[in-house]
């Protein structure tokens, strides 16, 4: 068996697990999960097991991937991701996404943000297919298991390339918070353009953020931290929050402790570098 | 039998009197003499920059970097059996392409004339540079004087010049946009010293600059269907995106008769007309039926994307231009003989077909000329099968009948001049049939979702 491609063995446990979960996803991904679904199912869903979702740790953001993205923000069908917030009488969403977790990984931050921001819709974006599947399965399981009190209805994930297609999803000034947690450090000099924070991409993030919206960054790589701080500080539309603000902000607390990467760093007793920035209003056009 | 390389690009000044053409890695200039109707060679410039030299510099630089890195890490120098350390020093070797390696083409791209018609701009693939020439019309030996050659970290794919003719805006293959003052000195270490003014995470295909209501803007188009509008020079403020394309965008233009309008085309089988101030698509002109009769075996999809019947054809608009003073656009689909001219109704902003013109060979490039006496299009053709005829066709508007037609006599005169300039057997642009530069590469921008995970 080709170890690098376990899918070649159609009876491997991973393949069987993935097939089963895929069918489950097809059935439940876009369904409005409430007590009636729960009654039908009659049992609790197991949370997905990470070991069945392994894949390469990196994805090339410049590649021509098979991606689903709307032609424009107006074409985005949010009801499929947040069916609980869709009003079928008006055909409109009752809320818009206001928080984005770019490169959400295994979804730890989303899950902790969900109860902390019950009035916001929170979207995770992740480029790796299997990791996205994991987060989807995790959210399906959590929604099902907490159907009685409608928990976890305000979070979801999409597989996508935020570096290319963020403006296809969000209108100008739609977001109030953007998270960049433990991004791929891309150590090599010539790969720096592949980093998620660059001076050119920051202009696009500024476009989707409203005035006084916040960019949160956290990493365990000091070089990357310095790079992100340098670029954000140089950008005319961002201003760093001070340490006191960070200490009093609940998102910083969640970000430090919630994400899987954060927990891993904790276990290894590594450092965590946090920097948060405020979106300044556009200056007068010259 | 060798032939003169087909013309890849042809541009003229507004009157059509000064003409510049690219053949292989050569730019040649002609002047139209009204008195005898002939084209006189005015100047010539050949890109003699050797890529080998650049590779050598890169190799030396990389070696120095590795040595420095080893030094820093304290990696031991290798030792001989006797225990003496030896300093390993190799001369930088230039990699020799192995058999089957793709040939290197020193293309010259993005030919354009400045607004005041005193400068010619172009880009050279050899060292990924932007070239600025002063057009010295009084210099009879060679009117092309290279005044600046600025290399960039990645290949410039589109350029434009600001209205004051002072700044060139460069959009590269890697998605970055740079702004370069023509008068500033050449920057040696462009990687370290030059920051992009804006960027996409996608190959850029077009860049425009315009002024509206006292504000300056830069428009950039890319392979990922995006047209982005940013302020200038505050290029960190994105004004908006124009959403609607479902395939790559290859060509954008803003007509000077209405600078609120932007027209775009590419892999979609339609021409899009936008009110870019409002961010609204006003019209889409579907050209599929017009073009289908001219689609040929050159348009068959590459093998790995081909269907079972082997008949999947893919085609895209190569270039779109607008006449400056009249509401007419012209475009062609890559590797076809058909030129399509559209007219825009200036009250409803709907496009309609004005005229189709079939050229004798596939079109490789289109540009415009227009002044108070005459207007029309300069068209270059893939004439490799013609026996050194039909390099260029000039198409002009006959104002009485309001139709465009090929100026055969004038085109023939120009072709004669090309042959006179390059007929010698040792001429640099003499090539064998299989040495012709690739002329059709727009369709390769089409995305097929090749990468799964």
Swiss-Prot record, chain A:
UniProt KW keywords: Methyltransferase, Nucleus, RNA-binding, S-adenosyl-L-methionine, Transferase, tRNA processing, tRNA-binding
Any one GO MF annotation of this record: tRNA (guanine(46)-N7)-methyltransferase activity
Catalytic activity: guanosine(46) in tRNA + S-adenosyl-L-methionine = N(7)-methylguanosine(46) in tRNA + S-adenosyl-L-homocysteine
Pfam family, one: Methyltransf_4
UniProt-listed InterPro entries: SAM-dependent_MTases_sf, Trm8_euk, tRNA_(Gua-N-7)_MeTrfase_Trmb
Record text on subunit structure and interactions: Forms a complex with TRM82.
HAMAP family: tRNA_methyltr_TrmB_euk
Record-given protein name: tRNA (guanine-N(7)-)-methyltransferase
Natural source organism: Vanderwaltozyma polyspora (strain ATCC 22028 / DSM 70294 / BCRC 21397 / CBS 2163 / NBRC 10782 / NRRL Y-8283 / UCD 57-17) (Kluyveromyces polysporus)
High-level lineage: Eukaryota, Fungi, Dikarya, Ascomycota, Saccharomycotina
Gene it is expressed from: TRM8
From Swiss-Prot, chain B:
GO biological process: tRNA (guanine-N7)-methylation
Keywords, sorted A to Z: Nucleus, Repeat, tRNA processing, WD repeat
Superkingdom as given in the UniProt entry: Eukaryota
Subcellular location: Nucleus
Single annotated GO MF: enzyme activator activity
GO cellular component: cytosol; nucleus; tRNA (m7G46) methyltransferase complex
Cited SUPFAM superfamilies: WD40 repeat-like (SSF50978)
Region: Disordered, residue numbers: 69-99
WD repeat coordinates: 103-143, 244-286
Pathway(s) where this gene product acts: tRNA modification; N(7)-methylguanine-tRNA biosynthesis
SMART domains: WD40 (SM00320)
Broad class of the protein's primary localization: nucleus
Function: Required for the formation of N(7)-methylguanine at position 46 (m7G46) in tRNA. In the complex, it is required to stabilize and induce conformational changes of the catalytic subunit.
Family matches, as PANTHER family: TRNA (GUANINE-N(7)-)-METHYLTRANSFERASE NON-CATALYTIC SUBUNIT WDR4, WD40 REPEAT PROTEIN 4
Subunit structure: Forms a heterodimer with the catalytic subunit TRM8.
Protein family (similarity comment): Belongs to the WD repeat TRM82 family.
Protein name, as recorded: tRNA (guanine-N(7)-)-methyltransferase non-catalytic subunit TRM82
Organism: Vanderwaltozyma polyspora (strain ATCC 22028 / DSM 70294 / BCRC 21397 / CBS 2163 / NBRC 10782 / NRRL Y-8283 / UCD 57-17)
């Amino acid at each position: 068996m080709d170890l690098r491609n376990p899918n070649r063995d159609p009876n491997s446990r991973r393949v069987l697990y993935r097939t089963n979960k895929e069918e489950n996803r097809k059935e439940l991904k876009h369904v409005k999960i409430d007590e009636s679904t729960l009654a039908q199912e009659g049992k609790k869903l197991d949370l997905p097991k990470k070991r069945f979702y392994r894949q390469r740790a990196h994805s090339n953001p410049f590649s021509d991937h098979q991606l689903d993205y709307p032609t424009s923000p107006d074409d985005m069908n949010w009801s499929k991701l947040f069916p609980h917030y869709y009003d079928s009488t008006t055909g409109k969403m009752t809320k818009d996404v206001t928080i984005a977790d770019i490169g959400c990984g295994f979804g730890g931050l989303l899950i902790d943000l969900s109860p902390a921001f019950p009035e916001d819709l929170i979207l995770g974006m992740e480029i790796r297919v299997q990791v996205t599947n994991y987060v989807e399965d995790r959210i399906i399981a959590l929604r099902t298991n907490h159907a009685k009190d409608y928990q976890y209805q305000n979070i979801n994930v999409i597989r996508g390339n935020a570096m290319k297609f963020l403006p296809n999803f969000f209108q100008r000034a739609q977001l109030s918070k953007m998270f960049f947690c433990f991004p791929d450090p891309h150590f090599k000099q010539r790969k720096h353009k592949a980093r998620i924070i660059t001076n050119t991409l920051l202009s696009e993030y500024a476009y989707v953020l409203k005035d006084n919206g916040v960019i949160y960054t956290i990493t365990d790589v000091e070089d990357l931290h310095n790079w992100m701080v340098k670029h954000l500080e140089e950008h005319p539309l961002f201003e760093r929050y001070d340490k006191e603000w960070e200490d009093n902000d609940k998102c910083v607390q969640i970000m430090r402790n919630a994400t899987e990467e954060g927990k891993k760093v904790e276990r290894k007793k590594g450092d965590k570098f946090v920097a948060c920035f405020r979106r300044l209003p556009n200056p007068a056009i010259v | 039998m060798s032939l003169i390389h087909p013309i890849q690009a042809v541009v003229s000044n507004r009157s059509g009197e000064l003409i510049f053409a690219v053949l292989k890695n050569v730019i040649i200039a002609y002047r139209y003499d009204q008195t005898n109707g002939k084209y006189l060679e005015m100047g010539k410039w050949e890109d003699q920059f050797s890529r080998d030299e650049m590779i050598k510099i890169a190799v030396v630089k990389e070696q120095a970097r590795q040595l420095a890195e080893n030094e820093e890490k304290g990696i031991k120098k290798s030792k001989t059996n006797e225990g003496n350390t030896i300093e390993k020093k190799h001369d930088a070797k230039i990699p020799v392409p192995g058999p089957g390696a793709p040939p290197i083409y020193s293309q010259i791209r993005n030919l354009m004339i400045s607004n005041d018609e005193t400068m010619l701009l172009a880009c050279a693939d050899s060292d990924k540079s932007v070239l600025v020439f002063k057009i010295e019309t009084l210099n009879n030996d060679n009117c092309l004087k290279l005044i600046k050659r600025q290399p960039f970290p990645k290949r410039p794919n589109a350029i434009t010049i600001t209205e004051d003719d002072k700044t060139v805006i460069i959009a590269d293959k890697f998605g970055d946009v740079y702004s370069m003052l023509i008068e500033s000195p050449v920057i040696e270490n462009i990687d370290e010293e030059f920051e992009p003014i804006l960027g996409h995470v996608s190959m850029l295909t077009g860049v425009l600059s315009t002024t509206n209501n006292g504000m300056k803007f830069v428009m950039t188009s890319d392979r990922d269907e995006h047209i982005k509008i940013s302020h200038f020079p505050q290029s960190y403020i994105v004004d908006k995106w124009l959403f609607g394309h479902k395939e790559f965008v290859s060509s954008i233009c803003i007509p000077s008769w209405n600078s609120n309008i932007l027209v775009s085309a590419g892999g979609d089988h339609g021409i899009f007309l936008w009110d870019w101030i409002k961010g609204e698509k006003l019209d889409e002109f579907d050209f599929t039926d017009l073009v289908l009769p001219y689609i040929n075996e050159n348009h068959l999809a590459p093998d790995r994307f081909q269907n079972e019947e082997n008949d999947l054809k893919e085609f895209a608009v190569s270039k779109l231009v607008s006449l400056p003073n009249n509401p007419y656009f012209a475009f062609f689909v890559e590797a076809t003989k058909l030129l399509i001219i559209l007219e825009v109704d200036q009250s409803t902003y709907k496009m309609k077909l004005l005229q189709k013109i079939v050229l004798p060979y596939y079109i490789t490039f289109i540009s415009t000329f227009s002044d108070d006496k005459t207007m029309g299009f300069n068209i270059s053709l893939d004439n490799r099968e013609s026996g050194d005829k039909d390099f260029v066709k000039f198409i002009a508007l006959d104002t009485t009948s309001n139709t465009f037609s090929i100026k055969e006599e004038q085109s023939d005169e120009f072709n004669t001049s090309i042959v006179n300039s390059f007929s010698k057997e040792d001429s640099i642009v003499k090539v064998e049939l299989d040495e012709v530069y690739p002329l059709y590469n727009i369709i390769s921008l089409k995305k097929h979702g090749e990468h799964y995970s």
